[in-house]
UniProtKB/Swiss-Prot annotation:
Native organism: Thermus thermophilus (strain ATCC 27634 / DSM 579 / HB8)
Entry's Gene Ontology molecular function annotations: structural constituent of ribosome
GO cellular component: cytosolic large ribosomal subunit
GO terms, biological process: translation
Entry protein name: Large ribosomal subunit protein uL30
SUPFAM superfamilies registered for this protein in UniProt: Ribosomal protein L30p/L7e
Family: Belongs to the universal ribosomal protein uL30 family.
Keywords for the protein's UniProt record, in alphabetical order: Ribonucleoprotein, Ribosomal protein
Length: 60
């Protein structure tokens, strides 16, 4: 199953609470922090909410 490498590249300060909650659900707390996550619909939904704050790449 493919996985997603998600990296927080922009600060969530000043953005709505739902976007901060999406980052928390992805496990991203600090700038430049990376997580490798399973590619599920729930993860994809959270990534799409904060697409302007993160960088995503598919990892096999």
């Amino acid at each position: 199953m493919p996985r997603l490498k998600v990296k927080l590249v922009k600060s969530p300060i000043g953005y709505p609470k739902d976007q901060k909650a999406a980052l928390k659900a992805l496990g991203l707390r600090r700038l430049q922090q990376e997580r490798v996550l399973e590619d599920t619909p729930a993860i994809r939904g959270n990534v799409e909410k904060v697409a302007h704050l993160v960088r995503v790449e598919v990892v096999e």
